[in-house]
Structures are given as C-alpha cells and as structure tokens.
C-alpha cells in the first residue's frame, strides 16, 4: 500500500510504517501526479483535496490531521466512495492555551486585570466551547455567538452585535462561503471601523474571516486597537504591513503543541486502521518524549494572580513566536513565504499545559481552581 503524506504530520513512520510505503512531500506541493498510484492520502489544512487533486488516482482514503475540513470537498469524496477522517478536537486545548497566553501577556503590557474584562467568542465549537469554560472559570464575563448552534437549540448564546461590544473578541469559526451563515469576511470593513480603540481582537481560525485590507487600514490609524493574528489570507505569502501592525503576529501555530499535532496523527491512524479492518496497535503515549518543563511548585503564600501568569508564560509565551515571525518580515517576498512555512515545519517542541505538573504546598482553593481552569495538572501538599 502506498501512502502519500504531508511531511509536517508528526510520527508518520511510527503510526503508519507497518501499513505500507510512506512518501512525504510539502503539503502545498502535493499534486495529482503524486497520487496516481497512491492508496492513502494524509494531509493538513494547506492541501486542497478535491476532484482536481484526486481525479484518476487510486486514493481510497483521505485523512486530515486537523480539526477542520474546509480544505476537503466532502461531497466529492462521498460521490467517489473515498473514506475520510479528520481529527476534531485534536488541538483545541492548544488553541485555548494560545489565546490564554495572549491575554496573560497583554494584561501585563496594557495594564489590566483579566477579571475586569468581558470576552466575546465568535464560534462556540470545540475550541470556542473550551475557551468559554476556561475563561468563565477564571472569572471573566464571556458572551459567545454561534448562529448555527443557536438555530439548533443551544442556549446562552448572544447576537453578533452584543459580542462585538466586548472588551476582547476572539474568533473560532470555520470558513464558509454558503449557507445561512457564511463566515468569509464576517468581520467586514464596517465592523472593523466600528471597533473601539480599547478593544482587543484575536484570530486563530481562518485569515479569510477578517477583511484584512480594512483591518490594516484601521491599524494604520494608530488609535489603540490591539490585534493578535495567527492566521492570514494567502498563507504563506502574508501581508507584511499588516503583520508589522499587529501586537502579536504568529505563523499559524496556535494549535501546534506536540500533544495536539500528534493527537491528530493518532486519530487518523485509528480511523484508517478501522477502515482497512486492521487492529489498532499503537497508542500516542508510546512515542511522546517527556516534556522539557515537567514540574513547577508554588508555596502557600504565593499571590494567585502572579502564580497563574507565571505558570502560563513559563509553559507558553506568545512573544517568542511573534518575534520569530517578525524577524522574517524584512526578507524579500519569496524568502518570507519560505520562512513562514519553515517556522511551521521546524516548530519547536511546545507541550500542552496538562503535561506540566504543578505542586501547591498548602495551596489555597482559589489558586487550585484558577490553575485547573486553564488545564494544568495539579497536586496539593
């Protein structure tokens, strides 16, 4: 069996090596020619999977090691009887941790307390739902907007207009062009122009959900709007001027914990095994190394807010990835695009909060609750 796979999918050989011959390629370069004699295709979000890619190939199963599947023509796969799996929820915790890190660092830089802010979440799917729960447990007032879920009967949802009045707006929608609730340029020029100077905007879903030209024009005014972008139009050839105007600009790595990325590999491995009628022989724990930061300890007298922010930034500080991307923006256009992909391909080992054990010596209940809210693994002595 021949398996063609995006070279950025981790642990390909340990999970799939016994199934067949693996051929790896940069995800953006996978073409119809590469798939003529392939049986299985494994991708990430940078590969558009449709009739043009798969026509006259032998591909019988497509696995996408990603939460979303906007890049896959599911109707075409169904019409051809091609099996499919993505990995819903695989990196949801990682994206939540990215947003929490942004808020932690911004609270210090801009001088505010988290519990004094309201947060508007646009899209209450797997990621948005987890973020809502975490921020609520941290004491923030959270309002979520998700019209499809509201139409399906979910409760405690708010209108887009209400959510856009929150101090912090964070985007977690799929990219859709059709249906009752299209999300392409959901934040259009009018909405962007009406954002308050004291608001914070974070986007970790899809770049096309925002009108980037309008956002760049707004930021060029320099009136105080704070923006953190991890996703962009036309990746990897992103808008340099917009990136330089962002408070934080990162190369589509919000979900890139080792745990989240490898969980995606494990999920599509499990689905392919079942599709082929094979036993599921491997588990993720067999292959993951110990995290570089395994343990932190706080004493009973520690200030809870200080402990929270220290733990968050020690585990993941968004400023590192921001500086890495902005360092590439001085290069010429072809080299910038290559560096964007290289930063993703060679991304450092970043582990999830739940891989770090925090010991609280005589810890207070409020500190236990606070650290637990964002996913840390706790023990109290």
UniProtKB/Swiss-Prot annotation:
HAMAP family: PdxB (MF_01825). CDD domains: ErythrP_dh. NAD(+) binds at residues 146, 173, 230, 255. The active site is at 206, 235, 252 (proton donor). Homodimer. The keyword Signal does not apply. Keywords: Cytoplasm, NAD, Oxidoreductase, Pyridoxine biosynthesis. Substrate binds at residues 45, 66, 256. SUPFAM superfamilies: Formate/glycerate dehydrogenase catalytic domain-like, NAD(P)-binding Rossmann-fold domains. PANTHER family: FORMATE DEHYDROGENASE 1. Its main location: cytoplasm. One of its GO terms (molecular function) is NAD binding. It catalyses: 4-phospho-D-erythronate + NAD(+) = (R)-3-hydroxy-2-oxo-4-phosphooxybutanoate + NADH + H(+). Signal peptide: none annotated. The keyword Coiled coil does not apply. GO terms for biological process: 'de novo' pyridoxal 5'-phosphate biosynthetic process; pyridoxine biosynthetic process. Belongs to the D-isomer specific 2-hydroxyacid dehydrogenase family. PdxB subfamily. It is found in: Cytoplasm. Pathway: Cofactor biosynthesis; pyridoxine 5'-phosphate biosynthesis; pyridoxine 5'-phosphate from D-erythrose 4-phosphate: step 2/5. GO terms for cellular component: cytosol. This is Erythronate-4-phosphate dehydrogenase. InterPro entries: D-isomer_2_OHA_DH_cat_dom, D-isomer_DH_CS, D-isomer_DH_NAD-bd, Erythronate-4-P_DHase, Erythronate-4-P_DHase_dimer, NAD(P)-bd_dom_sf, PdxB_dimer_sf. Its EC number is 1.1.1.290. Catalyzes the oxidation of erythronate-4-phosphate to 3-hydroxy-2-oxo-4-phosphonooxybutanoate.
